[in-house]
Amino acid sequence: MKERDSRNQIGDLPFRVKEGFSVYEFIEQLYEANVVERINRFLVKVTFNGKEFLAHLHDPGRLKDLIYPGNLVLIRETKGYKTKFSITAAYSNSRFVVLDSRLHNIIASKFLPEAYEKEIKVGNSRIDFKYDNTYLEVKGCTLVENEIAYFPDAPTERGRTHLKELRELMKKGFNAILLILVMRDDAKCFLPNEKTDPKFSIEFWNSIKEGLNVNIKTFKLVGNKIIYVRDIPLCKTNLT
């Protein structure tokens, strides 16, 4: 595995958050639990304090390396849901990987200027942020294999649509950034997951050729805080 030369990495964001900076803090207490089974995309049965509970999982990915019987997870109490708990993170490679996709845009906003718009309608979809002359779409990444972060871990038609919309915006003279939040700190570089979603991979590389900026940031969970670790580059391939 080779990293792309970091000098060629494009897509720097305007607000330079320092490495080691906390970008989110959970106010709820985090409890350790174990997975019994995944009921469906958004529901997981867990054991906690010797009892079984249903926990909400706010991440539609396959997560086969994270949500499986017996694996250790962190849960927190949540209000306004049918379940008492939400899954916050799952254990993998000696660390907890944050799984709650509701946090992605909150974290992304820490790297933006104060004046920005949210959820801007573009074509038949919505792009997460706009500031100045730039549109920015956020994607969360939890899959890491052999120090390479991969997105997506399940086919994503929505992700492909967002890339197409960003390309159309670039044709109209706007800047476009794809911000990838790797919610763990054991990746050294990033690649689109060609094996899982070859169509997304094609759209990804075509978008870069047409001027899409890509910014990839890694994070780690320390206590009840999500810490920004560092930016990582695209892995070196025959397409970079």
From Swiss-Prot:
In terms of domain of life, where is this protein from? Archaea
Query: One MF term from GO for this chain?
Result: DNA binding
Q: Which cysteines are joined by disulfide bonds?
A: none
Known InterPro entries for this protein?
SfsA (IPR005224), SfsA_C (IPR040452), SfsA_N (IPR041465)
Question: Which Pfam families does the record associate with it?
Answer: SfsA, SfsA_N
User: Sorted alphabetically, which NCBIfam families does this protein's record hold?
Assistant: sfsA
Query: Which family does the record claim for this protein?
Result: Belongs to the SfsA family.
Name this protein carries in UniProt: Sugar fermentation stimulation protein homolog
Organism listed in the record: Saccharolobus islandicus (strain M.14.25 / Kamchatka #1)
